[in-house]
């Protein structure tokens, strides 16, 4: 009982922090996107708990990320989507699909995500895990959501950001491929990748 209460308190704080950050942007679409992230996580938590499976936990984050980016992109532009918004949204969605697919495939091959052996047995603990995933999506996406809602202009800084994204994305793919082949990336620049 004591642990259950703590799990619910942590979940409440995660939502409070995330939604508060959304409110602080002063942009309704960003706040609503953050709320949407939690709704998606909680809706997908239901079948996950009923079937005691973590197999689509990472896909929940993927679906949430794509949904909130598209929501903000389409709701904050009054039907006029500028090229900068399209580029940033496309890069985020591309990264999200790659990471989500990699994580889902890895868990599918392994048969389970060992982190969830005990977690998925407890309603409050599993709920907290899904809620914290909603927080992770919200906090990681909030800067991009704010930029998209304000309209991203293509400037030199934007192009530098795109180049940095491409380099980081390539390193992440290389690292994931090596990790998938059980090659440890402990030297040179690949040691910094978090795959």
List PLM regions with ranges.
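Membrane-anchoring alpha-helices and their flanking helix-loop junctions
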Residues: 1-193
């Amino acid at each position: 009982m004591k642990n259950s209460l703590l799990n619910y308190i942590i979940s409440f704080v995660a939502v409070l922090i995330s939604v508060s950050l959304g409110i602080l942007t002063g942009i309704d679409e960003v706040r609503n996107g953050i709320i949407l992230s939690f709704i998606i996580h909680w809706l997908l938590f239901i079948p996950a708990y009923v079937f005691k499976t973590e197999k689509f936990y990472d896909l929940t984050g993927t679906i949430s990320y794509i949904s909130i980016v598209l929501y903000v992109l389409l709701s904050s532009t009054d039907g006029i989507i500028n090229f900068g918004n399209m580029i940033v949204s496309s890069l985020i969605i591309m990264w999200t699909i790659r990471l989500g697919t990699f994580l889902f495939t890895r868990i599918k091959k392994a048969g389970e995500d060992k982190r969830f052996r005990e977690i998925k047995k407890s309603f409050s603990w599993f709920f907290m895990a899904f809620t914290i995933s909603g927080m992770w999506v919200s906090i990681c996406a909030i800067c991009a959501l704010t930029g998209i809602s304000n309209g991203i202009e293509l400037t030199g800084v934007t192009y530098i950001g795109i180049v940095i994204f491409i380099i980081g994305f390539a390193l992440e793919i290389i690292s994931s491929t090596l990790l998938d082949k059980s090659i440890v990336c402990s030297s040179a620049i690949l040691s910094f990748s978090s795959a």
